[in-house]
A protein has these predicted regions:
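A short, flexible loop at the N-terminus of ABC-type nucleotide-binding domains that lies
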Residues: 1-33, 74-76, 109
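ABC ATPase nucleotide-binding domain "signature" region
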Residues: 38, 84, 147-153
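The feature captures the beta-strand-to-loop junction immediately N-terminal to the Walker
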Residues: 40-42
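Helix-to-loop junction immediately C-terminal to a conserved catalytic motif
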Residues: 55
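Conserved ABC transporter NBD signature motif
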Residues: 63-71
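Conserved ABC ATPase "signature" region
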Residues: 71-73, 106, 113-131, 162
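Conserved ABC ATPase signature
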Residues: 135-139, 143
Length: 166
């Protein structure tokens, strides 16, 4: 992960007038390359909003986001090279475990041989190898969350992996 610098605030209102109008009060934060960080706070305090701003799913109403010294505030999620693992597993029930893990790589045009190798590595790491040919629809919630995690980890070009209450 490249160094991440945040100097932002976010409101869903056009002209916030008070602290209560903000989903995220003005903040400045720095996350160094290679670190592991946790955002702690009560429900509704803005943790998910901040993760969505970092990943590019939401644009902050004020301020900027920088990766490795480059401003990415207006860049798409794809251009940011971020993987996000959401609280509720994001998988395709109509696909097998292997197809779910391969999905991000196929969408980026990775060669089939590389996809097979990388899917195998991730499946082994997450103890999903025995289930690769199983339909995702029949799996328990914890296995579905592992698949969601695997989809975040399968790409070797990811700058950061964000976990939202996985």
């Amino acid at each position: 992960m490249a160094r991440l610098d945040l100097d932002l605030a976010h409101s869903y209102k056009a002209n916030p007038q008070s602290d209560e109008d903000y989903a995220l009060l003005p903040l400045k934060m720095c996350f160094d390359d290679g670190g592991a960080y946790a955002l702690l706070g009560p429900s509704g305090c803005g943790k998910t909003t901040l993760l969505n701003i970092i990943s590019g799913l939401i644009r902050p109403s004020q301020g900027s986001v920088h990766f490795g010294g480059t401003e990415v505030t207006n860049k798409t999620p794809q251009a940011r090279n971020i993987a996000q693992v959401f609280q509720f597993p994001v998988i395709y029930d109509t696909m097998t475990v292997a197809e779910n893990l391969a999905f991000p790589l196929r969408n980026r045009g990775v060669a089939p041989a590389q996809i097979k190798q990388r899917v195998g590595q991730i499946a082994e790491m997450l103890e999903l190898s025995a289930q690769l040919d199983s339909p995702a629809s029949g799996l328990a919630a914890d296995a579905k969350q592992k698949i969601s995690l695997g989809r975040g980890l399968v790409r070797s070009d990811v700058s950061a992996v964000l976990f939202d209450e996985p």
